[in-house]
Amino acid sequence: MCIRDSIYAASDGPSLTRELEYALSLGAPARLVKPEGLPFPVREALCFERQAQLSPLPFLAALLPELTVYEHSPVRDIRGHRVRCDGGTVTAEQIVVATHFPMLERFGLYDLRLRQERSYLLALTGAPPLPGMWLDAGEEGWSLRRSGRYLLLGGGGHRCGENLGDSYDRLRAQAQRLFPAAQEAFAWSSQDCMTLDGVPYIGPYSSSAPFLHVATGFGKWGMTGSMVAATLLTARLTGENYPYADIFSPQRFFPSASISAFWEGAGYAVRGIGRRLFVPAQTAAADIARGHGGIVAWQGKKYGVYRHTDGTLFAVDIRCPHRGCELTWNDDEKSWDCPCHGSRFDYTGHRLSEPAKAALKPCKDFPQEI
């Protein structure tokens, strides 16, 4: 861990003065600055002084000696105080569900109160050193911070299932604009749960199951949100008072911040099912280029078809096994993604991320070459 300034920068758009006023009213160590000598234009910036930049792997390594971790033991269901795993059943008085997207669907309606977004990162070498950690106030939300000899450039976020196939290209173009002499060392992506009002859900899983607790919806601020969750849930489990518990409670409801997002999420689900049922496939298998995928009609049904770089075709059921929404092709990562709730699958149908609990069914009769 190291201590660095965290800087929220604006190159255009509205002033950050109101952000400063809110920060100061909360007692945050903030001030407006006008940085100079940077490789990109900054009109003004809001600086939060002496923030912790945390590397998660060393942090977890330090925790491991205090924990007992059971690997290869996925939880399949929770009934009352009994947690059913592949290798047996665990009984506990209190249970915390910290599975990224909450796994229990009969409590809490979390699939209606969460959406999932993807974002992308590059690790660059040869970039000039930057002081502090940077976050762009613009729509793209570019972020910059150092990690050892690498400069990490992130951004290009979008709702899962809405990838246009150019996310890495846009990030690389931004890297070229900002740091033309830098070289790309690594590229990867992440997926985050987003709540209706932007505040994590931390607390009771459901009012009908007081022994169940949840932590989710960290909204791309996972290291910060997880520390809040650890503090809040520890207080809750030990009977202590946490002064901000109501703010994070999953049972809260702020109509002005939540109702439009709720209906937006419901609309995605309706459109996802409607597209599968009523919108015909627009692609012929013969037209799918190597390394690409598309939705194809075959023998009266729609399938997701990917053509491998060797020419072999892989066809899978295009219905998400979670709620039946039609999946979309993610050309950047060669995956089938659900725009409704964020489940993802590779081109063979293997499940990559939740909330779906099953893989896609392959179409074994589909011709391997067309």
Kindly give the residue locations of the regions a language model identified.
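Rossmann-like flavin
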Residues: 4-62
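Short, well-ordered coil/turn residues at beta-beta hairpins
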Residues: 10, 73, 85-86, 92, ...
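C-terminal catalytic lobe of FAD-dependent flavoproteins
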Residues: 22, 50, 138-139, 148, ...
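A conserved short coil-to-beta-strand element within the FAD-binding core of flavoproteins
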Residues: 33-38, 71-84
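Flavin-dependent oxidoreductases
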Residues: 78-146, 272, 276, 280-286
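Rieske [2Fe-2S] iron-sulfur-binding domain
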Residues: 122, 292-369
